[in-house]
Amino acid sequence: METIYDFVVETNKGVTYKLDAYKGDVMLIVNTASECGFTSQFEGLQSLYEKYKDQGFVILGFPCNQFGGQEPGSGEEAAQNCKLNYGVTFPMHQKIDVKGEHQLPLFRYLTAAQHGFFNEKIKWNFTKFLVDREGNVVKRFAPQKKPVQIEREIEKLL
């Protein structure tokens, strides 16, 4: 049976790795865009990461250009933009598709595990998936849900 730890992803620098690198950690996996109305959420995400990273919490950002063309650059450009404008230090990855024919398998797995209000498909940037220390996808948060609003859910898993 497939688990979240079986998936291979690629960092914004082009390095591939398996998510088993985060076995035992709480993960928040987010599709991001640097020209979106929700882009200011990077500040809140970074605050959560800084507050809880030493307790086994990680945020994984995946730039996506499928919603309004709001991530026009490369994954590396997106990561640089996030670091420069929002101080992002959590792991950022290559630009990916979160739906459709070229959907990253990880996001197929996440959407199957937590269907969300709109059934399976991700409808916009900054959809967030919370994964517990055992690798279970326990919650899906809509883009409108600000990072501060999900902090209690993260704390419960730490």
Curated annotation (Swiss-Prot):
Positions of disulphide bridges: none
Keywords, in A-Z order: Oxidoreductase, Peroxidase
KW Oxidoreductase (keyword) present: yes
GO BP terms in the entry: cellular response to oxidative stress
Keyword Oxidoreductase appears in the UniProt entry: yes
PROSITE patterns per UniProt: GLUTATHIONE_PEROXID_2 (PS00763), GLUTATHIONE_PEROXID_3 (PS51355)
GO MF, one annotated term: peroxidase activity
Superkingdom, taxonomy of origin: Bacteria
Positions annotated as active site in the UniProt record: 36
Family, as annotated: Belongs to the glutathione peroxidase family.
Protein's name according to its UniProt entry: Glutathione peroxidase homolog BsaA
Gene name of the record: bsaA
